[in-house]
Amino acid sequence: QYNNAGPYLLGVLIQRKTEKNLIEYLTPRLFDKLEIKPLEAEFCPKGYVFGAGGLQMNVRELGKFGQLYLQRGKWKGEQILSEKWIEESTKKQVECGDYNNSQVDGYGYLFWHLKGDAYMANGKYGQYCIVLSDQNSVISVNSPETEQSDRVGRYIMKKLKEGRRNNGKE
């Protein structure tokens, strides 16, 4: 079942092993290559990056991240993430838990698996990066939500469902 402990512990392990926090570790390997900077993140009281969230990106940067996944880990001719990682991280690994959305059918490694050939990463205040592989599309959204809510996500999912129904893909 989904929870935030796994991604948090991954960040802790990376920092202990490399002596660099998660952002410092990922910057030359991922963020610099995608031209995403400067990055801000939330830290826990013990000094570790909160690996399950708190990463701040604008909508264009979020879209680049989604495009990297849509392109199976390849960016400007370089394989930044392995295709195997893309495949494993975006497929259903565990049940959704209490995430109540009719378009979500499971959780992968940091991604929600959606019905059809689609998946998304989302933030607690209305940030979404949705990859629609079957439509060769990425949708990135930064909304001004001030409360932890999935109102924006529900609206997006409703419109995607309507679009798929109209295109005969549901």
Enumerate the language-model features and the residues they cover.
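Catalytic-site signature segments of enzymes, centered on catalytic residues
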Residues: 1-53
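A beta-strand-loop signature enriched in Asp, Gly, Thr, and Trp
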Residues: 41-50, 72-97
